[in-house]
Amino acid sequence: MTRWVPTKREEKYGVAFYNYDARGADELSLQIGDTVHILETYEGWYRGYTLRKKSKKGIFPASYIHLKEAIVEGKGQHETVIPGDLPLIQEVTTTLREWSTIWRQLYVQDNREMFRSVRHMIYDLIEWRSQILSGTLPQDELKELKKKVTAKIDYGNRILDLDLVVRDEDGNILDPELTSTISLFRAHEIASKQVEERLQEEKSQKQNIDINRQAKFAATPSLALFVNLKNVVCKIGEDAEVLMSLYDPVESKFISENYLVRWSSSGLPKDIDRLHNLRAVFTDLGSKDLKREKISFVCQIVRVGRMELRDNNTRKLTSGLRRPFGVAVMDVTDIINGKVDDEDKQHFIPFQPVAGENDFLQTVINKVIAAKEVNHKGQGLWVTLKLLPGDIHQIRKEFPHLVDRTTAVARKTGFPEIIMPGDVRNDIYVTLVQGDFDKGSKTTAKNVEVTVSVYDEDGKRLEHVIFPGAGDEAISEYKSVIYYQVKQPRWFETVKVAIPIEDVNRSHLRFTFRHRSSQDSKDKSEKIFALAFVKLMRYDGTTLRDGEHDLIVYKAEAKKLEDAATYLSLPSTKAELEEKGHSATGKSMQSLGSCTISKDSFQISTLVCSTKLTQNVDLLGLLKWRSNTSLLQQNLRQLMKVDGGEVVKFLQDTLDALFNIMMENSESETFDTLVFDALVFIIGLIADRKFQHFNPVLETYIKKHFSATLAYTKLTKVLKNYVDGAEKPGVNEQLYKAMKALESIFKFIVRSRILFNQLYENKGEADFVESLLQLFRSINDMMSSMSDQTVRVKGAALKYLPTIVNDVKLVFDPKELSKMFTEFILNVPMGLLTIQKLYCLIEIVHSDLFTQHDCREILLPMMTDQLKYHLERQEDLEACCQLLSHILEVLYRKDVGPTQRHVQIIMEKLLRTVNRTVISMGRDSELIGNFVACMTAILRQMEDYHYAHLIKTFGKMRTDVVDFLMETFIMFKNLIGKNVYPFDWVIMNMVQNKVFLRAINQYADMLNKKFLDQANFELQLWNNYFHLAVAFLTQESLQLENFSSAKRAKILNKYGDMRRQIGFEIRDMWYNLGQHKIKFIPEMVGPILEMTLIPETELRKATIPIFFDMMQCEFHSTRSFQMFENEIITKLDHEVEGGRGDEQYKVLFDKILLEHCRKHKYLAKTGETFVKLVVRLMERLLDYRTIMHDENKENRMSCTVNVLNFYKEIEREEMYIRYLYKLCDLHKECDNYTEAAYTLLLHAKLLKWSEDVCVAHLTQRDGYQATTQGQLKEQLYQEIIHYFDKGKMWEEAIALGKELAEQYENEMFDYEQLSELLKKQAQFYENIVKVIRPKPDYFAVGYYGQGFPTFLRGKVFIYRGKEYERREDFEARLLTQFPNAEKMKTTSPPGDDIKNSPGQYIQCFTVKPKLDLPPKFHRPVSEQIVSFYRVNEVQRFEYSRPIRKGEKNPDNEFANMWIERTIYTTAYKLPGILRWFEVKSVFMVEISPLENAIETMQLTNDKINSMVQQHLDDPSLPINPLSMLLNGIVDPAVMGGFANYEKAFFTDRYLQEHPEAHEKIEKLKDLIAWQIPFLAEGIRIHGDKVTEALRPFHERMEACFKQLKEKVEKEYGVRIMPSSLDDRRGSRPRSMVRSFTMPSSSRPLSVASVSSLSSDSTPSRPGSDGFALEPLLPKKMHSRSQDKLDKDDLEKEKKDKKKEKRNSKHQEIFEKEFKPTDISLQQSEAVILSETISPLRPQRPKSQVMNVIGSERRFSVSPSSPSSQQTPPPVTPRAKLSFSMQSSLELNGMTGADVADVPPPLPLKGSVADYGNLMENQDLLGSPTPPPPPPHQRHLPPPLPSKTPPPPPPKTTRKQASVDSGIVQ
């Protein structure tokens, strides 16, 4: 039988290369790239887990896995796999996984810019990873790529706020276990700086500037300009030379060699192979060139061909002449300065031709530079340019794609700023400047051509030594440009002459002049007419001086001048001629020998760039000193004046000469000082930046070429003499220079002694040692001098003396040297040269001396004393810190011998000093990080032995130990609470934590040993310990649950969970306290609570029992645990709000403490009560925290109220007030000013009008400046009144104002404030009467299902809607808050299935507030006053729906239409401190049909009454609502008369069946009768205000009213209104408000409402109030259900309405006056509602009116109703009204009296109607919801191991694969 078998080593690790979806519980889902640890295998299946989620094991197909090499460690359960990849590959892989997760989040958050950045970085890393894995890269490229990879990772981590990775120089991640603390700190600093620079670069690139680039170029000693010539667009017609060079327009001179390209007449390069490879690099540019005001790139084009282009007869014409053609100039200053960099950009340089034949190219160049633009006519050059850092060797290495061996190199004319030792040159730059040539026998000036060549003294021409430009071959003679018939040509043409060094002294330059004719025949006959020359070597052996030379032009007579011997003896320049006593200015021709000097003149300039030839005679004299020893002293002195460049060129020769002079005069001391000074001068030169690269040459000379065995004695002696005479003025300066050269001098001394020992076997050792000792003593004596003259020399000695250590110890005892240095430092006077002294010590630490144990024994005590002295005085902290860092770093090394004793020295002398320095240092100090690193390093390097020894160092002074521990605890706590290192320095922070943890535990042992017994107990010390330990445990960087799983695993693996370690230590320390525990209660409750709240289960279990221990302690002491209880409640609030605590903690707290309490004899009952109290508080606080950051502020308000009510219940006033203000702030954020006011009022009620002092917790806000309760209460009242005013709750504001006014008037006597207050009150009264206040709707909302938080679950709330908020809007808002909730379709209470389901169900419908008028208003009062109480100060709400009882009456449905009314009572009145309150009681009543009719009639009368009153009060009101209201009642076509009531209730049969209803029937008749006078008044007002357009409408209404009035008065009697409504406007007649209002005892509980016809029947509905209803018969009942309306009927009804509308002519007239939105047609089951526009709500467009026809519970009447046939044709829309039931407004919304308000119209708002109010256990009508899709049918599981696994799907494209794996492309 086969079975699962463990995998072999090579099968342990693999990567999924395709997605796999688990198809069973035992399987493991895989994503592409998942790495798996494979444990077992079985027939094509593997079992294991992914490394990203190790807890989930499962099986998966082997065919989906690519196996990889891995290192397997451990066995069985402890087996782990470590990938066998390169560390860098592993890092890239981990990084990619981490970034990809964040990448997805960025996509979800729609952070596009960052998403793209991360995508580019991910793609780069994937590509580079592939390159590294390919193994094909050469080592240097691999190294470069590694740098790029690590830089990219570090940059990406920073921008994604991930941890900083620290690396060594090779880019490998540092292991903190193997790295010293100081090195780790420095690595973090470097990494952070590099990433910061990289960020700046990215930022600069976005701004198109590259500051770093400019800085980089400025810091580079050598630069080069790369030029790529793309094309020359120029119509030349002949061959040409294109000469490119750099030019300084300010100095008008060329600064580089030419780059020469020969161009053919066909428009292509002559060398066709270089067609696309015309590249050159202009090298040797330096900082001086960057400082030039301007640099131009100049291109000169020289035509090579005929004299004149226009000549056509080419056969007879001279060819091959170099003629000026034109120039092209471009300013490259910005490119050279690094401001512009784009190697791909092609620059067009416009071409400027020469204007005439006598236009010199130099002149044209200057003209073009001066001109603003060039008329180039499309002619010019195309080039690309790029500035490159480095010399030619670096450039070739770093930019091989630009510069290769074929690239022409054009050097700067002259030496670069930094002369490289290997740069051997012997170049002479010759420039043809100008000439002046007599025309001689010719009629016009000559066409002069100058030919340059090089000859030796034998007259032999040197071949191929002239270079016309880079990129061209060497030539033997150079011919100048010819200017046509110009007497004084100016050429400015430069060529380079490169002659072998051995030929220079024999060579001379020869210039011949010839007239060139345009005719070939004439030209051949033209001979050389003159000659000039100049020798390259002067008579004194030096080379030709740089600069201009005015050459003598000799006439070319026959063949005389062909013989060099003939003219070489003659002077070559005018200067030489003058030296020989001849006149150089005489116009007459002079004859010298056989040669005649011409009148012509000719100037050249030269520049020698040679590392082998010198122009300095003094240097030459020194090098050849033996030839004239009498001048030796002079030559040695003159050497100090020679240009440095000349000296370094001949460095080895010069040094040889100096030491030869010294050795050959060994007996004499004559030249010793001079040679020493010369040596110091040369060493000083090499220290100069310009010649710093010669330092290796000097080093090599000392090691390999130096051979003066006795030099050490003389050098030592001279140096000592200088030191001894340090205070002499002349000596001081030279000694200073010698000190700067000390390192090299000692190298010479040591090397000399070693050479001597090799020859003479240590002969004279004692003398040598003694001479050195004498020298050091002299230096030490000098250091103790107080003279001001020696300060500079002493500073130099401190700086340069340490540099000799590593050399001197080769020939001198290191211990003696250490003693010398100790004395050297101690001799420096305190207070002088402190910083130099400290840096000197740093250099000593860096030297080999400090790595030797015995030397350290001597040096370290001195160093620690110095550090202690300066640290205590806060002097030069940076240098102190550096010194201590370097010492600690050396002591960390394993190769420096024993260090335990030295760590002890540092601990004893410096630990406390460093601690105090850290404590005194501000967090903003740049050095704080360094000092903390030093302190951490000391602690880390201390062993247990050191800690034990530390206490002994304090001796018997117990207070010292206490102080030390106090300082340390406070410092640790500060460092933990406010870390000095950035959050992303994770490794540094973890190392620090590890060190601190060990130190804290070590110090805890000291506490237990020394400060626990009764006599020595230190309360504050223990207190500080506990606070520190808790701060350590709760610090952010240790909260592992906040980190990614990978980071958590790394930390646990490296450091473990330090929280547990210290948590258990805290527990033990607490129990160790014994009898002292009571001293820590209640102070330690908070810290211990913080600790127990850490989400680590074992830690919680171990530490929660401490609370019981605290309860016991306090109980034993005081017989209660009140202090503990108060403290834990207060602190728990802060902690939970701060994010700590969870459900598990609540359970553990409950369980553990209850267990302990129940076992205790006395605490069983009180303890249990306390635990339950805390658990209840925790529940509320956790609820509060859960939604504290929720967008849903209403939930936040609910939870806040729950918490504050709890605090009120347990009488925690401080906490209660705290939450009141949280609630108030939330209300203000939502503009709930009314609720904010009620909330503040709760605080005000806690205060008295007294002078009692205000305790701190009462003044919760900084804004309140109050010392007494009375003052605070006054301020609160002012604020509350302000909020009530903003919330339009003027009645409440007035009530408070009266109370405040009483105080101002009778207690405070503050009449000024009283005056202000009364003015406000007056305004409030006016507002009540005049300002329209929108009536809010109220909604009942039930939350069912276990998915809701506890504070909502299973509860019903009444919500107060916002202004103008309809039910649909409210529901939408509600469902936005709970997007997963399902809206219930019925208004019936839900069953247990819904209540217990895991989901969320919301039930929402409109309810109507029940008016509860204050007794004072039970008399005639203005509707404006009463209307406030209809929707405010309400606690009871009703919801009504019609039900049928008895037999169905087809003639009159109202006879058996009952109303079922549900009354909801809330916990508090609305509005209150919330916009909603929980329903506390629900009961139901039934309203009979008759009572319903009475209510409806009463409301109709009230409505007419109210509107009439409004028009009397304000004649400017629009007439439209009144028109519709009146017409709806009086027009029999609309309402059908009173037939419905009469048929239903006014019959003998009804009275027989309901004998008790007699009184009510009379009441109904009375109400009908009273309607007539109201209508009469309304019609009178209407008649007064009606427009002419509507006059027919009014007349018809009057006719209808007349009929109605006659009928009513006949049957029900006449009612008469009081005299004049106008006269009674101030106090309304009783008949207007109360006469039709039934006594409360006889009235039904509330007004029934068919509102339930639509749960949205809210006042916000258009046309939902302002009319009455008439009882009519139902149109049709559906056979299947009374609750369903046939769709066909709906459609038919709509069509009928449209038809009626079309048929009515009056309707058209009506609509002209009334806008289309003024009338909305609604139909209901029992009535067809024709509603006038509600003045209460803004008018909405028809599209927003609910399609009430869709509801089946409607009362409708057939259009062919009998009553409508008996009346005149209607002028109003055929929407019917009924008196028997109210409009949807009246049922569950507002009463008819609400018509008082005429708010502004609201914006359009589309919505879908939803009429759930009437439905009884039936679906609400509205937009149909499609049935949910069938549950997803899962595929059958794949075959398990008994069968082979499914094959992987076929390979897809990368994009598909990415999509499959969930990666966003």
UniProtKB/Swiss-Prot annotation:
<feature type="modified residue" description="Phosphoserine">
    <location>
        <position position="1743"/>
    </location>
</feature>
<feature type="modified residue" description="Phosphoserine">
    <location>
        <position position="1751"/>
    </location>
</feature>
<dbReference type="InterPro" id="IPR042455">
    <property type="entry name" value="DOCK_N_sub1"/>
</dbReference>
<feature type="modified residue" description="Phosphoserine">
    <location>
        <position position="1764"/>
    </location>
</feature>
<feature type="compositionally biased region" description="Polar residues">
    <location>
        <begin position="1855"/>
        <end position="1865"/>
    </location>
</feature>
<keyword id="KW-0581">Phagocytosis</keyword>
<keyword id="KW-0963">Cytoplasm</keyword>
<feature type="compositionally biased region" description="Basic residues">
    <location>
        <begin position="1695"/>
        <end position="1704"/>
    </location>
</feature>
<dbReference type="InterPro" id="IPR056372">
    <property type="entry name" value="TPR_DOCK"/>
</dbReference>
<dbReference type="Pfam" id="PF20422">
    <property type="entry name" value="DHR-2_Lobe_B"/>
</dbReference>
<dbReference type="GO" id="GO:0032045">
    <property type="term" value="C:guanyl-nucleotide exchange factor complex"/>
</dbReference>
<dbReference type="InterPro" id="IPR035892">
    <property type="entry name" value="C2_domain_sf"/>
</dbReference>
<comment type="subunit">
    <text>Interacts with the SH3 domains of CRK and NCK2 via multiple sites. Interacts with nucleotide-free RAC1 via its DOCKER domain. Interacts with ELMO1, ELMO2 and probably ELMO3 via its SH3 domain. Interacts with ADGRB1. Identified in a complex with AUTS2 and ELMO2.</text>
</comment>
<dbReference type="GO" id="GO:0005886">
    <property type="term" value="C:plasma membrane"/>
</dbReference>
<feature type="compositionally biased region" description="Low complexity">
    <location>
        <begin position="1639"/>
        <end position="1666"/>
    </location>
</feature>
<feature type="region of interest" description="Disordered">
    <location>
        <begin position="1619"/>
        <end position="1716"/>
    </location>
</feature>
<dbReference type="Pfam" id="PF16172">
    <property type="entry name" value="DOCK_N"/>
</dbReference>
<dbReference type="InterPro" id="IPR026791">
    <property type="entry name" value="DOCK"/>
</dbReference>
<comment type="function">
    <text>Involved in cytoskeletal rearrangements required for phagocytosis of apoptotic cells and cell motility. Along with DOCK1, mediates CRK/CRKL regulation of epithelial and endothelial cell spreading and migration on type IV collagen. Functions as a guanine nucleotide exchange factor (GEF), which activates Rac Rho small GTPases by exchanging bound GDP for free GTP. Its GEF activity may be enhanced by ELMO1.</text>
</comment>
<feature type="modified residue" description="Phosphothreonine">
    <location>
        <position position="1767"/>
    </location>
</feature>
<dbReference type="InterPro" id="IPR046773">
    <property type="entry name" value="DOCKER_Lobe_C"/>
</dbReference>
<dbReference type="GO" id="GO:0005085">
    <property type="term" value="F:guanyl-nucleotide exchange factor activity"/>
</dbReference>
<feature type="compositionally biased region" description="Basic and acidic residues">
    <location>
        <begin position="1705"/>
        <end position="1716"/>
    </location>
</feature>
<feature type="short sequence motif" description="SH3-binding; interaction with CRK">
    <location>
        <begin position="1838"/>
        <end position="1843"/>
    </location>
</feature>
<dbReference type="InterPro" id="IPR027357">
    <property type="entry name" value="DOCKER_dom"/>
</dbReference>
<dbReference type="GO" id="GO:0005737">
    <property type="term" value="C:cytoplasm"/>
</dbReference>
<dbReference type="InterPro" id="IPR043161">
    <property type="entry name" value="DOCK_C_lobe_A"/>
</dbReference>
<dbReference type="GO" id="GO:0007520">
    <property type="term" value="P:myoblast fusion"/>
</dbReference>
<dbReference type="GO" id="GO:0005096">
    <property type="term" value="F:GTPase activator activity"/>
</dbReference>
<feature type="modified residue" description="Phosphoserine">
    <location>
        <position position="1681"/>
    </location>
</feature>
<dbReference type="InterPro" id="IPR027007">
    <property type="entry name" value="C2_DOCK-type_domain"/>
</dbReference>
<dbReference type="InterPro" id="IPR036028">
    <property type="entry name" value="SH3-like_dom_sf"/>
</dbReference>
<dbReference type="InterPro" id="IPR043162">
    <property type="entry name" value="DOCK_C_lobe_C"/>
</dbReference>
<dbReference type="GO" id="GO:0005829">
    <property type="term" value="C:cytosol"/>
</dbReference>
<dbReference type="GO" id="GO:0007165">
    <property type="term" value="P:signal transduction"/>
</dbReference>
<dbReference type="GO" id="GO:0098794">
    <property type="term" value="C:postsynapse"/>
</dbReference>
<feature type="region of interest" description="Interaction with NCK2 third SH3 domain (major)">
    <location>
        <begin position="1820"/>
        <end position="1836"/>
    </location>
</feature>
<keyword id="KW-0729">SH3-binding</keyword>
<feature type="domain" description="SH3">
    <location>
        <begin position="9"/>
        <end position="70"/>
    </location>
</feature>
<keyword id="KW-0053">Apoptosis</keyword>
<feature type="domain" description="C2 DOCK-type">
    <location>
        <begin position="425"/>
        <end position="609"/>
    </location>
</feature>
<feature type="region of interest" description="Interaction with NCK2 second and third SH3 domain (minor)">
    <location>
        <begin position="1793"/>
        <end position="1819"/>
    </location>
</feature>
